[in-house]
Amino acid sequence: MTAHLIDGKAIAANLRQQIAQRVAERRQQGLRTPGLAVILVGTDPASQVYVSHKRKDCEEVGFISQAFDLPSDTTQQALTDLIDRLNDDPAVDGILLQLPLPAHLDASLLLERIRPDKDVDGFHPYNIGRLAQRIPLLRPCTPKGIMTLLESTGQDLYGMNAVIVGASNIVGRPMAMELLLAGCTVTVCHRFTKDLAGHVGRADLVVVAAGKPGLVKGEWVKEGAIVIDVGINRQEDGKLVGDVVYETALPRAGWITPVPGGVGPMTRACLLENTLYAAEELHK
């Protein structure tokens, strides 16, 4: 058996097409064009690439994109003032603060400064709290994108044993809440977990988001399981690999995401989806 590939690139392209169509319809109806403000502090190369992709995505779907490229020595107060200004700007539906920030800045305080109805990354405690209370509003982009990928398989998640490897605030923890909402029995593994192989081996669905290349061995995977690999790691030869050993997982899994081309494109597409939702439902 060889796993079915979950093509995140194609699914994300379809989602962007739907968003672009809705933006065009809004224009025809005389409604405001959705706006996204992207804040980048410093010159981190990976962050610069991510931000350029997000700006291109905005252009593709017809959003108005505002770019704020700030120097590395930008102060906490200057960033706070900028966020306050964007919070009050009716043309801005979403505010994205690109992480990581330089060490002298307090990311938690700045993320909390973003108005919850403009928090299109879904990181604000208010939005995480709503997800925990089973009344999600703006949902964290990567877990939201993963749920769309899972829906594309047509598999019924109710009652599945789901294992998440990695307990970050960005992926692991909100992913656990998403899968609970979907009716899964959820186990979250982390750096102190004993017998990781045993947990993975019992899972009908595995989501791996640890940032460690090859952490999950293919032979651990249960026959027919769904494998979602969030990891994206660059090797010395320049090749991008995930947190799962893809070659050995492929013949065992029922469904699997490739790296690259799996989860990453969906994270970006869901940022656009959240921005459109904010424009249509929260900023009427």
Curated annotation (Swiss-Prot):
Alphabetical list of HAMAP family matching this protein: THF_DHG_CYH
Keywords from the UniProt entry: Amino-acid biosynthesis, Histidine biosynthesis, Hydrolase, Methionine biosynthesis, Multifunctional enzyme, NADP, One-carbon metabolism, Oxidoreductase, Purine biosynthesis
Biological process terms in GO annotation: L-histidine biosynthetic process; methionine biosynthetic process; purine nucleotide biosynthetic process; tetrahydrofolate interconversion
Record has Hydrolase as a keyword: yes
InterPro entries recorded: Aminoacid_DH-like_N_sf, NAD(P)-bd_dom_sf, THF_DH/CycHdrlase, THF_DH/CycHdrlase_cat_dom, THF_DH/CycHdrlase_NAD-bd_dom
Organism lineage: Bacteria, Pseudomonadati, Pseudomonadota, Gammaproteobacteria, Pseudomonadales
Gene Ontology terms for molecular function: methenyltetrahydrofolate cyclohydrolase activity; methylenetetrahydrofolate dehydrogenase (NADP+) activity
Record-linked Pfam families: THF_DHG_CYH, THF_DHG_CYH_C
Gene that this sequence comes from: folD
EC number(s) per entry: 1.5.1.5, 3.5.4.9
Subunit-structure text: Homodimer.
Residues bound to NADP(+): G166, A167, S168, I232
Top-rank taxon: Bacteria
Protein name: Bifunctional protein FolD
Annotated pathway: One-carbon metabolism; tetrahydrofolate interconversion
Coiled-coil spans in chain: none
Protein function: Catalyzes the oxidation of 5,10-methylenetetrahydrofolate to 5,10-methenyltetrahydrofolate and then the hydrolysis of 5,10-methenyltetrahydrofolate to 10-formyltetrahydrofolate.
UniProt keyword annotation of rRNA-binding present: no
Substrates-to-products reaction catalysed: (6R)-5,10-methylene-5,6,7,8-tetrahydrofolate + NADP(+) = (6R)-5,10-methenyltetrahydrofolate + NADPH; (6R)-5,10-methenyltetrahydrofolate + H2O = (6R)-10-formyltetrahydrofolate + H(+)
A cellular component annotation (GO) from this entry: cytosol
